[in-house]
């Protein structure tokens, strides 16, 4: 069973874990901001309380934390998303992607899901393409991908 826990409801232990994972080299290498300090992290989480354009979730599978998913630039038509599995945990990318699609299309009710992918993040790009995302733009560092709800297969419940 999958459970999402809003970052606004995290306990202090979870906040510290996310901080540690976020700065882990396997994760931070694919972030625009490579390293954050703990004060920045706390400020970011506090600011989420007032920001309706952003939603961040800790993802649990059968009571075990498996990763983080987020939604930013949320409008009635689209949103951008991000995800990462906790370091050294393999095989949960598709689970996280399923939760992203369910939340975006069923809760946020957007038509289009968007993301940017570092060009050297081959695992993420492969996951997105397996989920029918298409590349709609690129620059020297990133591919920009999107998925329209109309192209989405029935979502597992």
From Swiss-Prot:
UniProt KW keywords: Acyltransferase, Transferase
PROSITE patterns noted in UniProt: GNAT (PS51186)
GO MF entries: acyltransferase activity, transferring groups other than amino-acyl groups
The EC number(s) this enzyme carries: 2.3.1.-
Top-level EC class: transferase
SUPFAM superfamilies assigned: Acyl-CoA N-acyltransferases (Nat)
Residue ranges constituting the N-acetyltransferase domain according to the UniProt record: 5-152
Function, as annotated: Catalyzes the third step in the biosynthesis of pseudaminic acid, a sialic-acid-like sugar that is used to modify flagellin.
The protein, known as: Acetyltransferase PseH
Organism in which the protein naturally occurs: Campylobacter jejuni subsp. jejuni serotype O:2 (strain ATCC 700819 / NCTC 11168)
Lineage: Bacteria, Pseudomonadati, Campylobacterota, Epsilonproteobacteria, Campylobacterales
Gene behind this protein: pseH
């Amino acid at each position: 069973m999958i459970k999402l826990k809003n970052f606004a409801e995290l306990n202090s232990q979870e906040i510290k874990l996310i901080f540690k994972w976020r700065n882990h080299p396997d994760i931070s290498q694919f972030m625009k901001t490579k390293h954050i300090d703990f004060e920045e992290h706390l400020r970011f989480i506090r600011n989420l309380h007032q920001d309706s354009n952003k939603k961040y979730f800790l993802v649990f599978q059968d009571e075990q934390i498996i990763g983080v998913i987020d939604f930013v630039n949320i409008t009635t038509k689209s949103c951008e998303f991000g995800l990462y599995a906790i370091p050294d945990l393999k095989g949960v990318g598709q689970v996280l992607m399923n939760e992203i699609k369910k939340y975006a299309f069923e809760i946020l009710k957007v038509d289009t899901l968007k993301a940017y992918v570092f060009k050297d993040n081959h695992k993420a790009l492969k996951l997105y393409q397996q989920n029918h995302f298409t590349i709609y733009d690129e620059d020297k560092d990133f591919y920009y991908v999107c998925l329209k709800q109309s192209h989405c297969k029935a979502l597992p419940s």
